[in-house]
Amino acid sequence: MKITAAVARSAQSDFTIEDLELEEPRDNEVLVKIVGVGICHSDISARDGQIPTELPVVLGHEGAGIVERVGAAVTTVKPGDHVVISFATCGDCAPCHNDQKNYCEAFPALNMLGIRLDGSKALNKGDEIISSHFFGQSSFANYALTYESNVVKVRSDAPLEILGPLGCGIQTGAGTFMRAFKCEAGSAVAVAGGGAVGLSGVLGAVVQGCHPIIVLEPHSE
């Protein structure tokens, strides 16, 4: 199908808006019409060669939208469902089975290389192959092809245009205090940096009952 996407073609350069061809969903894949997407520093790092993603590539990994079509083996979502897209995991390794999917043994291959596990890519522009499946989604586009394993269904009245960062930045910050540190109520915490990830960490600390919560920000003077 024809889509419009922001393509990263070289390091330190602007993204270009281009018309591309996107494959139909495979058995375990979900086609999502993107409503909103965040931009993360990891997208810039991939464009600039700090993450080993082959250029040209469609980046974007904080997508949210509406399911358009699903592959034959998909059972957890259906067309019309509202979803947030997070990182991809294999579901078969020990960390995945132990509810530690962020430590998935296939994480680099599934998320950072711009390919499926079989080495294929889902995007092209004529004879030119474009890297896809960045963090299992490549959501800097009006449509993204993702995996069933990394879409999370949300309420139909949830504001999709602002939910995308739940897939990366917000869970990174909040998860630090709620899952990694498992802070107990009354714990004193300090957060260095009051950006999106830092403030999400503050919210996670509030949920855990931490006190005091201190945010450190550089001062221009």
Q: Language-model segments: what does each one mean?
A:
Residues 2-4:
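Extreme N-terminal starter segment of soluble prokaryotic enzymes
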Residues 7-14:
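Extracellular beta-rich ligand/substrate-recognition surface
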Residues 21-22, 54-60, 132-136, 142-143:
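Short Gly/Pro-enriched turn/cap motifs at secondary-structure boundaries
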Residues 23-37, 47-97, 110, 153-157:
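Glycine-rich beta-strand-centered segment in the early N-terminal region that forms part
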Residues 87-149:
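Cysteine-cluster motifs in flexible loop/terminal segments that predominantly coordinate metals
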Residues 142-143, 149-151, 155-221:
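Mid-domain Rossmann-like dinucleotide-binding core that forms the NAD(H)/NADP(H) cofactor-binding site
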